[in-house]
Amino acid sequence: KKFIGIGSALMRQQEVFDGVEERYFFENVVDFINSKVFNSLADEVILLKGARSFGFDQLTELLVKKVHETVLEVNLNAVVDNLNWYRSFLKPETKLVCMIKADAYGAGAVEIAKTLEEHRVDYLAVAVADEGATLRRNGIKSNIMIMNPEMSSFKTLFDYELEPEIYSFRLLDALIKAAEKEGITGYPVHIKFDTGMHRLGFNPRTDIAQLIEKLRHQNALIPRSVFSHFVGSDNNDFDSFSAEQFKLFDEGSKQLQSAFSHRILRHIDNSAGIEHFPERQLDMCRLGLGLYGINPRNNEIINNVSTLKTTILQMRNVPKGETV
């Protein structure tokens, strides 16, 4: 998209680069450094190529200095290593959802999404529709799940082919109405069961009959998956309760599946559950904190992903008794 040529030879051959969207030419490095083009560089990936005689070493130094003194370095290779570590617990056919909400917990959602897409993750998941739209605008084509869809965001969901979590009858009714108004049929959604977390979700004991009735008597939406969330898969003290949760989810999800001819993916294992309950991986698992290097089972680092670096501004020797 952008080409910057330095040197008299390139100055004479400018027409060769007529097909480049943005192109600039300078007689020497000093002219480039003093130009508006250099001062406007921001959020760029820059490839420097040229002989030492051009003095690109001083250019490199100045470009590095343009970076903030406090930076968060994200190691994408470590992300892949963590992904593969958790995949080692899964059967080859088990699908994987990777959580990249809140800008991938500060690691940079677009960059993380591109890396995960390259490594064939089945689903990405973000909190709200705007996050999903940003990924789409940056070329992400993977399935994207929206965990907290807002009723004001339905148009964004449809425009960017984002798949919402459905956790209440109010949300379900509103989304059906919006989809029917747009003439949409068969739009994929993900059904949330509350098996003990008590945040969001349908009660698989008391709500299942009404849920099936509503889903079967419309064709705007289809359940793509059904899922729940372990309360304490990171703590052995909750193992009995986790077993109760799984039993409740297993029964409710099978009842939902029996009402439809197409396959509905089931998932309940999170990062800790993948390691602690591999026998409960079902059709799909959700990988969150573990992807970023934190093992929720012991709070130890698997492969460190993020490193915060800064500069010490000043070191002071303060006499005892002085205020700080």
What is the meaning of each model-derived region?
Residues R12, S88-L175, H276:
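N-terminal active-site wall of soluble small-molecule enzyme domains
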